[in-house]
A protein has these predicted regions:
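Beta-propeller-forming repeat regions
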Residues: 33-140, 145-295, 300-369
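Gram-positive cell-envelope targeting signals
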Residues: 1-37
């Protein structure tokens, strides 16, 4: 994230770093890549960075292969450059998002593609970006400079909730432009606080966080942080491999969203296992049931959850969807179902009893009369 006068140096350095990230990503060493393929990757990295650094004016954006997201262009004041237009654009070839900043004469004074949304597929140029869901300009750190809150939409085949998910990010303004604190971006996305601008703001400004839902070791710790147990659905169950455990479904309210989790807690109050049935959904609308029964016929109790969730549609509308999760108890713990989901989708009027019987029938159980 370097100003215009250093751009040629930045382009060379960024190209090198991007290529290194591709060549030495965690998975890369698992595959044999021929020298010609390595050269192709290096050439692609350099070609992309050359196009990016060649954008000197707003008119160059489209000419060098970037499509401006017209409805997300905003004016703002940047201390280093004065009044500018923030122009987000999507690279046509690799679906990478770039933020260009231009002055009143249309000159590009700053640009960056160093965004969390461009790191969804580690070590690759091609990303999953589909567009921008929300942008907000706020002074988040109290230095009298406007920072940028950004939420993008990414899509891949194996995600739930319309096969799309959100990625949150924050760019803090400094004396030279903007910088990212990757630790904050990591927490925003790793702990599901990327659902809305208000959600991210609640974390960054108000100090609330969902992190404890994933790191707490006891039920008391969960409750101390505001986790609300669904007492009517909480009960003791004997799990063949884990012993007597309290099944604890519950919620945590942050901003305008309700986060849903299920825990298994032992007699000493320690969390033995946790489940995240929401997946990529944004909000729990209604919890319809939690059941502990042997579903796959191996003599061990499994866990089934049925709920109604909500998420934001492509046009900003709220979408409601019934969905279920089944976790099979095995020797090493619990494993989520992947087979039944290929054949059975719950309906708006589906019940927990119907779900359990359908799942048991799939595994060869005789229907109960």
């Amino acid at each position: 994230m370097i100003p215009l006068k250093y751009r040629s140096f930045y382009a060379r350095a960024a190209a090198g770093l991007l290529c290194l990230s591709v060549l030495f990503s965690p998975w890369y060493g698992r595959f044999t890549v021929h020298a010609a393929e390595e050269q192709d990757i290096l050439s692609a990295c350099h070609a992309y960075q050359k196009r990016l650094s060649s954008v000197k004016k707003e008119a160059d954006i489209a000419a060098y292969g970037f499509d401006i997201i017209e409805n997300q262009v905003f004016s703002m004041t940047v201390k280093a450059f004065g009044d500018v237009s923030m122009i987000p654009a999507m690279d046509r070839t690799y679906h990478r998002l770039v933020l260009f900043f231009t002055d009143e004469d249309g000159n590009t004074v700053y640009s960056t593609d160093q965004l969390e949304t461009n790191n969804q597929v580690r070590g690759e140029l091609r990303q999953l970006n589909q567009g921008i869901s929300a942008v907000s300009f706020q002074d988040l750190d109290g230095d009298d400079k406007m920072d940028i809150l950004l939420i993008t939409s990414c899509e891949k085949n194996d995600s739930a909730a319309g096969k799309a998910y959100k990625v949150g990010d924050v760019l803090f303004q400094n004396e030279h432009g903007f910088y990212r604190d990757w630790r904050l971006s990591d927490k925003i996305n790793r702990f599901g606080m990327n659902k809305s601008i208000r959600f991210i703001e609640s974390f960054l400004v108000d100090g609330y966080s969902t992190e404890f839902l994933y790191t707490a070791s006891t039920l008391d710790e969960l409750k101390e942080h505001g986790f609300a147990v669904a007492e009517e659905l909480s009960s003791w169950r004997t799990f063949e491999k884990l012993g007597s455990l309290l099944v604890v479904p519950g919620t945590y309210r942050m901003a305008e969203y309700t986060v849903f989790m299920v825990y298994l807690v032992n007699e000493q109050g320690y969390i033995v296992w946790s489940f995240q049935p929401m997946g990529d959904y944004e909000n729990l609308y209604t919890l319809k049931g939690v059941a502990c029964r042997d579903i796959d016929g191996d003599g061990m109790k499994d866990l089934a959850v049925l709920a109604r969730y909500s998420y934001e549609g492509k046009d900003g509308e709220m979408v409601l969807e019934n969905d279920y999760s089944i976790y099979y108890q095995k020797t090493g713990g619990f494993y989520p179902d992947t087979e039944l989901r290929k054949q059975y989708q719950s309906k708006d009027d589906s019940t927990m009893e119907e779900l359990v019987e359908t799942a048991r029938a799939y595994w060869g159980w005789r229907q109960e009369s």
